[in-house]
Amino acid sequence: MALEQAMQAARRGDLDVLRSLHAAGLLGPSLRDPLDALPVHHAARSGKLHCLRYLVEEVALPAVSRARNGATPAHDAAATGYLSCLQWLLTQGGCRVQEKDNSGATVLHLAARFGHPDVVNWLLYQGGANSAITTDTGALPIHYAAAKGDLPSMKLLVGHYPEGVNAQTNNGATPLYLACQEGHLEVTKYLVQECSADPHLRAQDGMTPLHAAAQMGHNPVLVWLVSFADVSFEQDHDGATAMHFAASRGHTKVLSWLLLHGAEISQDLWGGTPLHDAAENGELECCQILAVNGAGLDVRDHDGYTAADLADFNGHTHCSRYLRTVQTLSLEHRVLSRDPSMDLEAKQPDSGMSSPNTTMSVQPPNFDLGSPTSTLSNYDSCSSSHSSSKGQRSTRGARSSDLQSYMDMLNPEPRSKQGKPSSLPPPPPPSFPPPPPPGTQLPPPPPGYPAPNPPVGLHLDNIYMQTKNKLRHVEVDSLKKEPSSGDGYSGLRRQDSGLLRQDSELLLRHNTGLRRQDSDRKQRSFSKQPSTGDYYRQLGRSPGEPLAARPGMAHSEEAALLPGNHVHNGCSADSKASRELPPPPPPPPLPEALSSPPPAPPLPIEGAGAACGQRRSSSSTGSTKSFNMMSPTGDNSELLAEIKAGKSLKPTPQSKGLTTVFSGSGQPASQPESPQPAVSPGPSRARSPTPPASGPQPLLNGSIVPAPPATLAPGVHLDVEALIPTLDEQGRPIPEWKRQVMVRKLQQKMQEEEEQRRKEEEEEARLASLPAWRRDILRKKLEEEREQKRKEEERQKLEEIQRAKEQSEKLRTLGYDEAKLAPWQRQVILKKGEIPK
């Protein structure tokens, strides 16, 4: 009880409670929360300088005490951006500016990581901070500023330490690489144009900033690099090009731009083309774009698989059926004209961050059989001039039935739902032997028991879908299982970014499909381990908000600048050498109350990547993590979609008035410290025009009109006339005609509010049935329309006010007293300039 009271009082700035606890002898160095933080830490991270000084000077709590991750109160103050507390701790509290936590991060690293340029400025020019100090991962503060996209901090750090512009971390990441990977165009321009950053520097696996931008789908950054930075479409150490990265992640806009600007469809060192990557990951639209641009549908990789084979083995039957069907068509027949009426539904713009298939592995094709449309985007009915059509079968005499079967392929769902037999023959079986069964099979049942009945009528497609769904399902209990410290971090090269991971507390979710058992490519398993970054992520969280949604700690502030073993495309370069390295120190466990945060409806945002095998693993991932990294393989698409939908994770002036209070069990509670309203992290619904009961009541013809209820229960009839008062403010009875006018106006207002509420509910229900990526895009579009409508209404209101002022001025100029004029007289005067006799 004393622990919870002390922590809450330190965060709220309640000095009286702290004094009473101290008088009772309950405040001491042993009073620590589950992460070993003292009340001094909580006061520093909340900006309560008076409580901080009281705890240090009068209670004699140590100001240099460290939490479990090695963080001092100065680290907490720097991470949350409270400069006054940081200044006092460094000048009078005994903390030192160069002190590191367990990951090697100083207060300057944390200020740059969480985007506090005022703190960075003071530390550099008055606090004596050294911007050349690296963390255990080899990261400078400038790396964190680049990953955060904090241009003011970036300029300060470059001016203080220009040599850091091209500095590389232990895995070869430069600030430019991290800025491109996170899509920070302004930081990218600044580094290249003003700081002369080298865009050709490669990470240890050969990836360039161009590859990083293509992998994460940042089309503006990629376009700028190609246009102004003199970079070419080169390959990394595995032979992968930017097109491979874009195709594997479903970034159709990036893929289209690369094809239209001279990028070639080439093979990597495994013999795989971008079509192989797109098919293996179930990216149907990318398969279509590549198919109409001359990608070889019958090209086999070094394992002997075509793109359709890979789609089959990973359960992406919609891709495999499409690819096998278009093999019989000529290149001209593959291209469909684009229907402008489908722009909103079928031609959704690429989010620039993630593929739709990161949240659902089977993407429902958006095609209408009656009006065949393709999301092949930017192409007309002729193939691109630069595309290679090598290896394609030319069947110009294709029958119309072939084209119709191709159209059926684009949308197989309606036929199956209607129960009509499919006219399309089943796809031919693979030409290679099926994978051998696993060696550990159950023994046959005893002879006395009848053999189990085989499944009846289970189609091959359903088998794949059921297997895939089972592989994707993760029980909540598995999230609490902590892997051993020897587990290596391996990432999907074209499924997840390698050098930088987002600061999302979303547990990992990966598309898990059937693997080719006879392939020589190793499977990768992914696990989430707590790190010292968990401590910093808890500094300002409210109970109802997701973990990375605290103002001031944006999703992109995390950089997986991993040290230790050099990992080449996800595989350790030398397993023996990796075994010789000492294991990392055990990370602090998360509080039990925070180990499984509640999922945000309608999509679950929690999962665990228990076993995800992909053809290519991510670059530059190691077996240890820095303090602020959850896992280098975390997928941040859902979080980024929420950000695009309006869930801003950046600090806002309205959100500065919140102090987050942590209880002893690690469960925080939000406490307002100023009259400013708190900004909800989620997209709020349109507010009802009904004023709050605590505010001033509206006046209608000089009488108070009660506010109608926000919602009524179904079947409840509200007597509106009973809500209208019979007496005015002076106690005089209101005439009946006036009350009837007030009743009609109140009824109209209630009807408008009910109609608005009904529209909002219908809109939410319609959006809930859509995939997450499309739902967020449509929600953003609707919000933009509402904003435009609001601005238009404000403009009209201002025009009416201006018109009324001009009319009043005209009446005064003519010598009339506006208060003594009847409305009809006022209108006549304004129209003719005089009162009729």
UniProtKB/Swiss-Prot annotation:
The biased composition feature labelled Polar residues covers 351-364, 627-636, 651-662
Domain of life, per lineage = Eukaryota
- Which residue windows does the record flag with biased composition (Low complexity)? 376-395, 617-626, 663-673
ANK repeat positions: 1-31, 35-66, 69-99, 103-132, 137-167, 171-201, 205-235, 238-267, 270-299
Q: What is its main location?
A: cytoplasm
Q: Which UniProt keywords apply?
A: Actin-binding, ANK repeat, Cell junction, Cell projection, Coiled coil, Cytoplasm, Cytoskeleton, Hearing, Phosphoprotein, Repeat, Synapse
Q: What is a single Pfam family found in this protein's UniProt entry?
A: Ank_2
User: Which positions carry Phosphoserine?
Assistant: 337, 341, 400-401, 497, 504, 531, 631, 670, 674, 680
The record lists the membrane-crossing segments as none
Biological process (GO) annotations held by this record are: actin filament bundle assembly; actin filament organization; locomotory behavior; microvillar actin bundle assembly; negative regulation of cytoskeleton organization; parallel actin filament bundle assembly; positive regulation of filopodium assembly; sensory perception of sound
Q: Which residues form a coiled coil?
A: 738-814
Mind telling me which InterPro entries this protein's record contains? Ankyrin_rpt, Ankyrin_rpt-contain_sf, Espin/Espin-like, WH2_dom
User: What PANTHER family has UniProt attached to this entry?
Assistant: ESPIN
Instruction: Note what the entry says on domains.
Output: The WH2-domain binds actin monomer and mediated actin bundle assembly.
Q: What is the recorded name of this protein?
A: Espin
Q: Which organism is it from?
A: Rattus norvegicus (Rat)
Encoding gene, per UniProt annotation = Espn
